């Protein structure tokens, strides 16, 4: 039973009988208006990456799982006029049965159905009008977070590179490592057609209450993890944050310089943020051999054991790989490629790029099959972070400031892998490519004696980024999609 009611702030709503019912309920008609820009700063809405659907955050006055389509514009195609119908359409997905007095309700209220019928008739007339050679379409204003421009922002950086020593590796902290210029810190990413919400660490932790965020990948993923820790703590010393690495087996192995990852928990909100090192995102298993070099089976078609073992504990999973897929690195790590449990050499997998493509597609396919079993989990695959051939430039945006156009991601491998799946893309490649001045190149190598810091040589790393810096923007894009 479905009743349609006008969209009023105080409209009384009660729970529905939840037996897998999918109901589309028109809850109101606003006055005609032009298409508006999506604005992620609306405090009452949480808009996903395409700025089309927003989940209301009202508590008592709205049915759970209600999704609102903010607005859309129906065009007539004689190019003389446009009719704008601004509708609010509630989408209620019901899963559990609750009965009240032996009756089931979705919404309680009343409205004249003639108004709804009139709208449908007008729409039908527009579509079926005579002498209209073109097909009627619905034009929707979308928001592509990967398109936009870098703009100056006096509120940047989000934290201090000096004060966030608790979470930052020295090599990523360019202020600690003696970089002389920091103009690159004063910019934020402005998407085309919508706004990224201004980061607020208190609100972020509240939204992530009782949740676990996992970054799994290579050193770029570790940078993003360290960036988020600095953002969530405001870059301050935070002794109350707990080291819970042992819960995930993240302890320092005997003879190793560091653990395979880190896990920290904010006790006030029970929010856990962790990082796990898996440069290839493959399952690495020592082979049965005793003579050096100790070979490691690199199972291209199996996700890392860490993901398989702890996936059920994650609420947000962020994956990345790319820069360790070279013949040189594979041989230095003594990795031996396997597929279906069998060693593969030559043929298709002789080309390392083919092996990378196969691995990414295999992992995304596996993860997509797992997501229905973990409905609370949101999974993202980060596109590759660009390596610049030269990065001795210190002038921000000398390569330009805008990314425009209708094209897709520069990382076509990740884009094609996630296409049509439940795994979302975190597209950071193009916007990062504009920021060659923000790498850690130009920092000083750590001197043997503190007195020699000024004479220490610099190093030329055009892959990793200074923090604060570009990975902070990656996290803002991630949070906007959550």
UniProtKB/Swiss-Prot annotation:
What's a Pfam family this protein contains? PC-Esterase
Q: From what superkingdom does this record's organism come?
A: Eukaryota
> Span of the secretion signal?
none
UniProt entry tagged with the keyword Transmembrane: yes
What subcellular locations does the record give? Membrane
Q: Where is this motif: DCXHWCLPGXXDXWN motif?
A: 461-475
Q: Which GO terms describe its biological process?
A: xylan biosynthetic process
Q: Where is this motif: GDS motif?
A: 217-219
* Gene Ontology molecular functions: transferase activity
Cellular component GO terms, alphabetical: chloroplast; Golgi apparatus; membrane
Return the InterPro entries for the record.
Answer: TBL_C, TBL_N
The way this protein sits in the membrane is described as:
Single-pass type II membrane protein
Membrane is among the record's keywords: yes
Broad class of the protein's primary localization? membrane
Q: Any coiled-coil ranges, and where?
A: none
Could you list this entry's UniProt keywords, alphabetically sorted: Membrane, Signal-anchor, Transmembrane, Transmembrane helix
Q: Please list every transmembrane segment annotated in the UniProt record, as residue ranges.
A: 109-129
Q: What else is known?
A: Contains 2 motifs that are conserved in esterases, but it is unlikely that this protein belongs to the catalytically active pectin esterases.
Function, please?
Answer: May act as a bridging protein that binds pectin and other cell wall polysaccharides. Probably involved in maintaining esterification of pectins. May be involved in the specific O-acetylation of cell wall polymers.
Q: Which family does it belong to?
A: Belongs to the PC-esterase family. TBL subfamily.
In Swiss-Prot or TrEMBL terms, this protein is called: Protein trichome birefringence-like 15
